[in-house]
Design a protein with these regions (language model features):
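A structural signal for multi-pass alpha-helical bundles of membrane permease subunits
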Residues: 24, 30-299
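Short, Lys/Arg-rich, polar N-terminal cytosolic tail immediately upstream
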Residues: 2-27
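An internal, D/E-rich "acidic patch" concept
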Residues: 1-6, 294-298
Length: 299
C-alpha cells in the first residue's frame, strides 16, 4: 500500500520563514477599464473646464463658432464685474447660503447621529412606529409643503429673513435613516454593553463609542446636505423676496435675468458660486471617500 504525503504551503498572508511578509496581490486594471475610466473622468471634468473657458473670455467670443477651447485673459475682469453688480449682490448671496447651508448641515448631522443611535441601539416604547412615521415624511413630495410652510412663515413674520430658509430644514428624515443603518452595521451591541458595564451613561456611550465610528457616514451626509441647500433655489426665491438679501442661487438668477446675453459674466458668477463647494470637497476628501467605500462594503 502506497501512501502519499502532501505538504501544504503556508496560508496566504502569513509571514515567510525568512521573516519577509508575503507580497499582497495587486489587481491591475485592463486597457478597456483604463480607457472607460478616462472617458468618464473627462466627461465629468469637461463642464467645469468649459465654465472656466467661457468665464475667461469676452461675451462676443463666447458665441463664436467653432468655439475656443482654451481660456482667455478676461477672467479677472468678468469676476470683478460680477462682484460690482449691486443687483445680483453675489457676495451677500454667498454669505447667506454659507450661513444657511452650514447651519442646516451641522444640525442635520448632529440630530441624525443622535436619533440614528437611538433607533438602532436603544429600546423604548413606540420605537418602530416613530421610525415608520419619520420614513413616511420622506414620501411626501416637497411641493405639497410649500403652501403650508409659506403661510407659517407669514404667521411667524419670517418673510425676507434668513431664518425662513434655515429653520424648516434643520432635521432630515433621510439623515436619521442613513445614520441608523450605519450604526447598526458599524457599532456592535457587545461594545455598547461593555461600555455600560464600565459605568458609562447613554450620552457618554454616544460621545465616546458611537460618534467616532460614525465619522465617515457623517462626512458623506454632511457633504450631501451642504450641496443640497447650497444649490437650493425654489424655496429661497419664494421667501426671500427682497433682492438685497438673496442666497447665491437667487443671485445667479438675478444675474441671468439682468444679463441674459452676457454669457461671460453669467459663467463667471457660476464659477464664483462653485468654488466653495470645491474647497469643501477637497478639505473632506478622505473622509468622504472612506464613508462611501465603507458603506459600499458593508451594504
Amino acid at each position: 500500500m502506497t501512501m502519499t504525503t502532501h505538504v501544504a504551503g503556508p496560508p496566504t498572508g502569513q509571514l515567510r520563514l525568512d521573516g519577509a511578509a508575503a507580497a499582497p496581490r495587486v489587481h491591475q486594471a485592463g486597457p478597456l477599464t483604463v480607457i472607460g475610466l478616462t472617458v468618464a473622468a473627462t466627461l465629468s471634468v469637461f463642464p467645469l473646464y468649459w465654465m472656466v473657458v467661457i468665464a475667461s473670455r469676452t461675451n462676443a467670443s463666447a458665441y463664436e463658432w467653432p468655439p475656443a477651447l482654451l481660456p482667455g485673459g478676461n477672467l479677472g475682469e468678468n469676476v470683478q464685474r460680477v462682484l460690482d453688480n449691486s443687483d445680483a449682490a453675489i457676495l451677500k448671496g454667498i454669505f447667506n447660503s454659507f450661513v444657511a447651508a452650514g447651519t442646516i448641515t451641522i444640525s442635520t448631522v448632529f440630530f441624525s447621529a443622535i436619533a440614528g443611535f437611538a433607533f438602532a441601539k436603544l429600546r423604548f416604547r413606540g420605537r418602530n412606529a416613530l421610525l415608520i412615521a419619520i420614513l413616511l415624511t420622506m414620501m411626501i413630495p416637497v411641493q405639497l409643503n410649500i403652501v403650508p410652510l409659506y403661510r407659517l412663515m407669514i404667521e411667524l413674520g419670517w418673510l425676507n429673513d434668513i431664518k425662513a430658509v434655515i429653520v424648516p430644514f434643520l432635521i432630515s428624515g433621510f439623515g436619521i435613516f442613513l445614520m441608523r443603518q450605519y450604526t447598526l452595521q458599524s457599532v456592535p451591541d457587545e461594545l455598547i454593553e461593555a461600555a455600560r458595564v464600565d459605568g458609562c451613561s447613554t450620552w457618554r456611550i454616544f460621545r465616546h463609542v458611537v460618534a467616532p465610528a460614525l465619522r465617515p457616514a457623517a462626512a458623506v451626509l454632511g457633504l450631501l446636505t451642504f450641496m443640497q441647500y447650497w444649490n437650493e433655489f425654489f424655496w429661497p426665491f419664494i421667501v426671500l423676496a427682497d433682492p438685497s438679501n438673496p442666497t447665491v442661487q437667487v443671485s445667479l438668477k438675478t444675474l441671468n435675468s439682468a444679463y441674459h446675453q452676457d454669457l461671460a459674466q453669467i459663467f463667471a458668477g457660476t464659477l464664483i458660486a462653485t468654488l466653495p463647494l470645491a474647497v469643501i470637497f477637497v478639505l473632506f476628501f478622505r473622509q468622504i471617500i472612506r464613508g462611501i467605500m465603507e458603506g459600499g462594503v458593508k451594504g
